[in-house]
């Protein structure tokens, strides 16, 4: 029997027209939705209700227990990317839905973007570009990275790559891992420290943890207050790691010098969101990993994960398939 495979959220188009599209279509009856709407529960269920396999392209489609309950034939969610915060993993385990992802594929691209945001916000590049185009000639002092302290919250694939890219700038590295360090900090030239020490001593704090029940809102008002008023925050991980109102207040009141943000609580950022009015923030639309190299490699990996699952040899497993159940 040919499995029904649905891509509910290929907007903006990533899979369509890529090198991964033909291999995916060879695996079953494939339906690709190239328009918005997957962020709405009823529409998501309409799209994937009869699916055996879902390939999740965008994190705004949320696979809750209620959604899974409406998809009785679903056997696999293959995620393009590493984040799983849009998937109820416990519900997947309970309902026998396997989950895979593509670890490490976007690590270099997101690490590059992290460094770019550090430079953009510390050097005030967007503001100076805007002022120069307007006929001004801004001459204010800038920050340089050499001699600064960079604190990394998380040393997964992206955090480690950021450390490697940052070292040639002459930056001192601190790191806090979510769990035992096991020598990971030393391996990238960083000093492992408690989070309180990292926040107090860092000139730049960069977030690289996954979003979970434990890390939701981790940088709250009390922890943000530990940072220097001259410090910068960079977030290319997940918006939910930071208490939004506390961050806005700190930036607005000068208790933080600035921030570079690629991720937000609500995506796309709604009109009127106070972060849009902050002059000391550099914003990008959660596209730090959106390079052609990442798209091609990540989508091919996600499709390969579907193929391996269908032949009973799953890889990159986040939630394992139930024993004894046929893949499709």
Question: Positions of the model-derived regions?
Answer:
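Rossmann-like dinucleotide-binding domain for NAD(H)/NADP(H)
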Residues: 99, 221, 230-328
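Oxidoreductase and adenylate-handling cofactor-binding alpha/beta cores
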Residues: 111-130, 148, 164-171, 300-313
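Phosphate/diphosphate ligand-binding glycine-rich loop within oxidoreductases
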Residues: 49-129, 142-143, 148
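Short glycine-/small-residue-rich Rossmann-like dinucleotide-binding loops
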Residues: 59, 203, 209-211, 237-238, ...
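Rossmann-like dinucleotide/phosphate-binding beta-alpha-beta segment
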Residues: 23, 139-229
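Structural alpha-helical scaffold elements that stabilize or flank donor/cofactor-binding regions
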Residues: 24, 44-47, 67-70, 197-198, ...
């Amino acid at each position: 029997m040919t499995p029904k495979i649905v891509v509910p959220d290929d907007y903006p188009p990533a899979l369509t027209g890529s090198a991964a599209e033909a291999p995916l279509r060879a695996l079953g009856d494939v339906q690709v939705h190239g328009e918005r709407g997957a962020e709405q529960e009823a529409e998501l269920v309409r799209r994937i209700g009869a699916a055996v396999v879902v390939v999740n392209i965008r994190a705004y489609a949320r696979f809750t227990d209620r959604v899974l309950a409406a998809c009785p034939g679903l056997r696999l969610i293959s995620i393009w990317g590493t984040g799983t915060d849009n998937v109820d993993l416990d519900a997947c385990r309970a309902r026998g839905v396997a989950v895979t992802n593509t670890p490490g594929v976007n690590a270099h691209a997101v690490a590059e973007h992290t460094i770019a945001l550090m430079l953009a916000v510390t050097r005030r590049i967007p503001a100076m570009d805007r002022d120069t185009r307007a006929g001004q000639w801004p001459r204010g002092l800038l920050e340089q990275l050499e001699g600064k302290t960079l604190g990394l919250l998380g040393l997964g694939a992206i955090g480690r790559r950021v450390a490697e890219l940052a070292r040639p700038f002459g930056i001192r590295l601190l790191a806090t891992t979510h769990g035992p360090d096991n020598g990971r900090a030393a391996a990238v030239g960083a000093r492992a420290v408690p989070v309180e020490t990292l926040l107090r001593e860092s000139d730049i704090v960069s977030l690289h943890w996954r979003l979970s029940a434990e890390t939701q809102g981790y940088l709250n008002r009390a922890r943000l207050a530990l940072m220097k008023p001259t410090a910068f925050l960079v977030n290319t991980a997940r918006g939910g790691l930071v208490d939004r109102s506390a961050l806005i207040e700190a930036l607005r009141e000068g208790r933080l010098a600035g921030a570079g943000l690629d991720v937000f609580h609500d995506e796309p950022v709604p009109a009127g969101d106070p972060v849009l009015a902050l002059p000391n923030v550099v914003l990008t639309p959660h596209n730090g990993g959106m390079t052609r190299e990442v798209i091609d490699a990540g989508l091919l990996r996600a499709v390969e994960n579907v193929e391996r699952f269908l032949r009973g040899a799953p890889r990159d497993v986040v939630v394992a398939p139930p024993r004894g159940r046929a893949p499709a």
